Protein backbone atom coordinates (compact mmCIF):
# COMPACT_ATOMS: atom_id res chain seq x y z
CA UNK A 1 0.00 0.00 0.00
CA UNK A 2 1.20 3.50 -0.82
CA UNK A 3 -0.39 6.51 0.83
CA UNK A 4 -0.09 10.23 0.04
CA UNK A 5 -1.83 12.47 2.57
CA UNK A 6 -2.85 16.09 2.13
CA UNK A 7 -4.87 18.66 4.08
CA UNK A 8 -7.95 18.17 1.94
CA UNK A 9 -10.68 19.99 3.93
CA UNK A 10 -12.70 16.82 4.45
CA UNK A 11 -12.53 15.79 0.82
CA UNK A 12 -12.87 12.05 0.27
CA UNK A 13 -9.89 9.75 0.33
CA UNK A 14 -9.34 8.18 -3.08
CA UNK A 15 -8.35 4.50 -2.97
CA UNK A 16 -6.92 3.22 -6.26
CA UNK A 17 -7.05 -0.53 -6.94
CA UNK A 18 -5.05 -2.02 -9.80
CA UNK A 19 -6.10 -4.98 -11.89
CA UNK A 20 -4.54 -8.20 -13.14
CA UNK A 21 -1.18 -8.37 -14.95
CA UNK A 22 -0.07 -5.06 -13.39
CA UNK A 23 0.93 -3.41 -10.13
CA UNK A 24 0.19 -0.10 -8.47
CA UNK A 25 2.45 1.79 -10.87
CA UNK A 26 -0.43 1.74 -13.39
CA UNK A 27 -1.80 4.65 -11.32
CA UNK A 28 1.37 6.80 -11.34
CA UNK A 29 0.10 9.45 -13.80
CA UNK A 30 -3.21 9.64 -11.91
CA UNK A 31 -1.44 10.04 -8.57
CA UNK A 32 0.71 12.84 -9.97
CA UNK A 33 -2.40 14.75 -11.02
CA UNK A 34 -4.46 14.25 -7.86
CA UNK A 35 -1.96 14.25 -5.02
CA UNK A 36 -2.21 18.00 -4.40
CA UNK A 37 -5.97 17.80 -3.84
CA UNK A 38 -6.78 14.46 -2.21
CA UNK A 39 -5.44 11.91 0.21
CA UNK A 40 -4.55 8.98 -2.04
CA UNK A 41 -4.08 5.32 -1.25
CA UNK A 42 -2.74 2.91 -3.87
CA UNK A 43 -3.87 -0.53 -2.77
CA UNK A 44 -1.79 -3.64 -3.44
CA UNK A 45 -4.26 -6.09 -4.96
CA UNK A 46 -3.13 -9.68 -4.17
CA UNK A 47 -4.72 -11.08 -7.37
CA UNK A 48 -5.39 -14.39 -5.61
CA UNK A 49 -9.16 -14.63 -5.94
CA UNK A 50 -12.40 -12.73 -5.48
CA UNK A 51 -12.69 -13.45 -1.75
CA UNK A 52 -9.06 -12.89 -0.68
CA UNK A 53 -8.68 -9.82 -2.88
CA UNK A 54 -11.88 -8.28 -1.55
CA UNK A 55 -10.95 -9.14 2.04
CA UNK A 56 -7.54 -7.53 1.62
CA UNK A 57 -9.10 -4.35 0.29
CA UNK A 58 -11.77 -4.31 3.00
CA UNK A 59 -9.07 -4.59 5.67
CA UNK A 60 -7.26 -1.62 4.15
CA UNK A 61 -10.46 0.42 4.13
CA UNK A 62 -10.81 -0.10 7.87
CA UNK A 63 -7.57 1.85 8.31
CA UNK A 64 -8.92 4.79 6.33
CA UNK A 65 -10.90 7.54 8.06
CA UNK A 66 -13.68 9.55 6.49
CA UNK A 67 -15.48 9.23 3.17
CA UNK A 68 -13.85 7.06 0.52
CA UNK A 69 -14.04 6.88 -3.26
CA UNK A 70 -13.04 3.43 -4.51
CA UNK A 71 -11.48 3.39 -7.97
CA UNK A 72 -10.85 0.08 -9.72
CA UNK A 73 -9.01 -0.64 -12.94
CA UNK A 74 -9.79 -3.76 -15.00
CA UNK A 75 -10.03 -6.75 -12.61
CA UNK A 76 -9.70 -4.24 -9.78
CA UNK A 77 -13.36 -3.51 -10.46
CA UNK A 78 -14.22 -6.94 -9.04
CA UNK A 79 -12.47 -6.05 -5.78
CA UNK A 80 -14.22 -2.69 -5.35
CA UNK A 81 -17.57 -4.24 -6.27
CA UNK A 82 -17.22 -6.66 -3.35
CA UNK A 83 -15.25 -4.64 -0.79
CA UNK A 84 -17.44 -1.57 -1.26
CA UNK A 85 -20.22 -3.31 0.66
CA UNK A 86 -17.98 -3.94 3.67
CA UNK A 87 -17.34 -0.35 4.75
CA UNK A 88 -19.88 2.33 5.48
CA UNK A 89 -17.25 4.94 4.63
CA UNK A 90 -17.26 4.06 0.94
CA UNK A 91 -19.44 6.67 -0.73
CA UNK A 92 -18.78 6.21 -4.46
CA UNK A 93 -17.26 3.83 -6.99
CA UNK A 94 -15.32 4.66 -10.15
CA UNK A 95 -14.81 1.91 -12.73
CA UNK A 96 -11.84 2.54 -15.03
CA UNK A 97 -11.93 0.09 -17.96
CA UNK A 98 -13.14 -2.23 -15.23
CA UNK A 99 -15.28 -5.27 -14.56
CA UNK A 100 -18.43 -4.79 -12.47
CA UNK A 101 -19.98 -8.22 -11.87
CA UNK A 102 -23.42 -8.98 -10.50
CA UNK A 103 -23.99 -11.36 -7.58
CA UNK A 104 -22.88 -14.94 -8.44
CA UNK A 105 -21.33 -13.66 -11.69
CA UNK A 106 -17.64 -14.15 -12.47
CA UNK A 107 -15.24 -12.34 -14.75
CA UNK A 108 -15.27 -15.43 -16.97
CA UNK A 109 -19.07 -15.25 -17.15
CA UNK A 110 -18.89 -11.67 -18.38
CA UNK A 111 -16.33 -12.50 -21.06
CA UNK A 112 -18.42 -15.45 -22.19
CA UNK A 113 -21.53 -13.31 -22.38
CA UNK A 114 -19.75 -10.66 -24.44
CA UNK A 115 -17.17 -12.39 -26.66
CA UNK A 116 -14.77 -10.53 -28.89
CA UNK A 117 -12.01 -9.50 -26.51
CA UNK A 118 -8.50 -10.73 -27.23
CA UNK A 119 -7.35 -11.26 -23.66
CA UNK A 120 -8.29 -14.92 -23.25
CA UNK A 121 -6.26 -15.99 -26.26
CA UNK A 122 -3.28 -14.01 -24.97
CA UNK A 123 -3.07 -15.79 -21.61
CA UNK A 124 -0.38 -18.30 -20.67
CA UNK A 125 -1.12 -20.51 -17.64
CA UNK A 126 1.65 -21.45 -15.24
CA UNK A 127 0.23 -24.52 -13.42
CA UNK A 128 0.33 -24.53 -9.63
CA UNK A 129 -1.48 -27.86 -9.35
CA UNK A 130 -3.74 -30.03 -11.46
CA UNK A 131 -6.60 -27.56 -10.95
CA UNK A 132 -4.94 -24.20 -10.36
CA UNK A 133 -2.65 -21.91 -12.30
CA UNK A 134 -1.18 -18.45 -12.32
CA UNK A 135 -2.12 -16.62 -15.50
CA UNK A 136 0.28 -14.38 -17.40
CA UNK A 137 -0.03 -12.48 -20.65
CA UNK A 138 2.12 -14.16 -23.27
CA UNK A 139 5.37 -12.37 -24.12
CA UNK A 140 4.90 -9.88 -26.90
CA UNK A 141 1.12 -9.71 -26.56
CA UNK A 142 0.89 -6.97 -23.91
CA UNK A 143 1.17 -4.04 -26.29
CA UNK A 144 -1.54 -5.09 -28.72
CA UNK A 145 -3.99 -6.49 -26.18
CA UNK A 146 -3.59 -4.23 -23.16
CA UNK A 147 -1.87 -1.02 -24.20
CA UNK A 148 -2.12 -0.39 -27.93
CA UNK A 149 -2.32 3.38 -27.50
CA UNK A 150 0.91 3.56 -25.47
CA UNK A 151 4.38 4.00 -26.98
CA UNK A 152 6.24 0.72 -27.30
CA UNK A 153 8.69 1.64 -24.54
CA UNK A 154 5.85 2.30 -22.09
CA UNK A 155 4.20 -0.99 -23.03
CA UNK A 156 7.49 -2.81 -22.44
CA UNK A 157 7.74 -1.28 -18.96
CA UNK A 158 4.19 -2.41 -18.24
CA UNK A 159 5.05 -5.94 -19.39
CA UNK A 160 8.22 -6.02 -17.29
CA UNK A 161 6.18 -5.28 -14.15
CA UNK A 162 3.52 -7.87 -14.95
CA UNK A 163 2.06 -9.73 -11.97
CA UNK A 164 0.12 -12.95 -12.48
CA UNK A 165 -3.49 -13.43 -11.50
CA UNK A 166 -4.70 -16.70 -10.01
CA UNK A 167 -7.03 -18.58 -12.33
CA UNK A 168 -9.65 -18.68 -9.58
CA UNK A 169 -9.85 -14.90 -9.57
CA UNK A 170 -11.41 -14.94 -13.03
CA UNK A 171 -13.69 -17.91 -12.42
CA UNK A 172 -14.79 -17.13 -8.86
CA UNK A 173 -18.32 -15.79 -8.34
CA UNK A 174 -18.86 -12.27 -7.07
CA UNK A 175 -20.83 -11.35 -3.97
CA UNK A 176 -23.41 -8.61 -3.45
CA UNK A 177 -22.40 -5.73 -5.73
CA UNK A 178 -21.67 -2.38 -4.11
CA UNK A 179 -22.82 -0.63 -7.28
CA UNK A 180 -26.40 -1.50 -6.37
CA UNK A 181 -26.32 0.87 -3.41
CA UNK A 182 -23.56 3.36 -4.21
CA UNK A 183 -23.35 6.06 -6.89
CA UNK A 184 -20.91 4.99 -9.57
CA UNK A 185 -19.06 6.37 -12.56
CA UNK A 186 -17.62 4.51 -15.56
CA UNK A 187 -14.81 5.58 -17.88
CA UNK A 188 -13.37 3.36 -20.60
CA UNK A 189 -11.91 3.43 -24.09
CA UNK A 190 -13.63 2.40 -27.28
CA UNK A 191 -10.46 0.64 -28.50
CA UNK A 192 -10.06 -1.70 -25.52
CA UNK A 193 -8.88 -4.99 -27.02
CA UNK A 194 -9.25 -7.00 -23.81
CA UNK A 195 -12.76 -6.01 -22.67
CA UNK A 196 -15.27 -5.54 -25.52
CA UNK A 197 -17.02 -2.17 -25.70
CA UNK A 198 -20.38 -3.96 -25.56
CA UNK A 199 -19.43 -5.38 -22.15
CA UNK A 200 -18.34 -1.98 -20.85
CA UNK A 201 -21.59 -0.42 -22.07
CA UNK A 202 -23.71 -3.19 -20.58
CA UNK A 203 -22.08 -2.97 -17.16
CA UNK A 204 -22.33 0.81 -16.94
CA UNK A 205 -26.02 0.86 -17.80
CA UNK A 206 -26.80 -2.12 -15.55
CA UNK A 207 -25.13 -0.35 -12.64
CA UNK A 208 -27.14 2.82 -13.24
CA UNK A 209 -23.99 4.91 -13.62
CA UNK A 210 -24.22 8.58 -12.71
CA UNK A 211 -22.05 9.29 -15.74
CA UNK A 212 -20.42 7.24 -18.49
CA UNK A 213 -17.38 8.53 -20.37
CA UNK A 214 -16.09 6.75 -23.45
CA UNK A 215 -12.62 7.84 -24.57
CA UNK A 216 -12.00 7.69 -28.31
CA UNK A 217 -9.14 5.42 -29.34
CA UNK A 218 -8.20 4.46 -25.78
CA UNK A 219 -6.97 1.01 -24.75
CA UNK A 220 -7.34 -0.98 -21.54
CA UNK A 221 -4.36 0.91 -20.06
CA UNK A 222 -6.46 4.03 -19.51
CA UNK A 223 -4.70 5.21 -16.31
CA UNK A 224 -1.43 5.39 -18.25
CA UNK A 225 -2.62 6.52 -21.67
CA UNK A 226 -5.51 8.82 -20.69
CA UNK A 227 -4.90 9.90 -17.08
CA UNK A 228 -6.67 13.23 -17.55
CA UNK A 229 -9.92 11.47 -18.47
CA UNK A 230 -9.55 9.21 -15.43
CA UNK A 231 -8.84 12.13 -13.11
CA UNK A 232 -11.75 14.15 -14.46
CA UNK A 233 -14.06 11.24 -13.70
CA UNK A 234 -12.72 10.88 -10.16
CA UNK A 235 -13.05 14.62 -9.58
CA UNK A 236 -16.64 14.50 -10.83
CA UNK A 237 -17.44 11.82 -8.27
CA UNK A 238 -15.73 13.81 -5.52
CA UNK A 239 -17.67 16.97 -6.39
CA UNK A 240 -20.97 15.15 -6.04
CA UNK A 241 -19.94 13.84 -2.63
CA UNK A 242 -18.89 17.26 -1.36
CA UNK A 243 -21.92 19.23 -2.57
CA UNK A 244 -23.61 20.98 0.36
CA UNK A 245 -26.93 19.53 1.44
CA UNK A 246 -29.59 22.27 1.38
CA UNK A 247 -31.22 23.13 4.69
CA UNK A 248 -34.91 22.85 3.85
CA UNK A 249 -37.32 24.09 6.49
CA UNK A 250 -40.85 22.68 6.28
CA UNK A 251 -43.67 25.18 5.88
Residue ranges and their predicted role:
Residues 9-50, 68, 89:
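Conserved HGGG/HGGXW glycine-rich cap/lid loop of the alpha/beta-hydrolase fold
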Residues 39-69, 83-85, 106-112:
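Active-site loop/oxyanion-hole signature of alpha/beta-hydrolase fold enzymes
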Residues 71-76, 80:
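Gly/Ala-rich beta-loop-alpha elbow adjacent to hydrolase catalytic centers
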Residues 85, 89-90, 94-130, 166-170:
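Flexible "cap/lid" loop of the alpha/beta hydrolase fold
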Residues 93, 183-192:
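Conserved strand-to-loop "acid loop" that flanks and positions the catalytic carboxylate
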Residues 190-218, 236:
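Conserved loop-alpha-helix segment in the C-terminal half of the alpha/beta-hydrolase fold
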Residues 214, 218-227, 248-249:
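Catalytic histidine-centered segment of alpha/beta-hydrolase-like enzymes
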Residues 223-239:
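Post-His helix in hydrolase/transferase enzymes
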Amino acid sequence: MSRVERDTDNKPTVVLVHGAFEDGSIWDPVVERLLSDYTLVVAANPLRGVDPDSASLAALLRLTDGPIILVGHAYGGVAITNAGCRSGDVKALVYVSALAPERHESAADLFERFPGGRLQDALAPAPLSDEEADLYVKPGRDHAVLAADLPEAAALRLAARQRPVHSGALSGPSGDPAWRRLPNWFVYGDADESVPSALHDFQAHRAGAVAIRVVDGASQALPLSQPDAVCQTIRAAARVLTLPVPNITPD
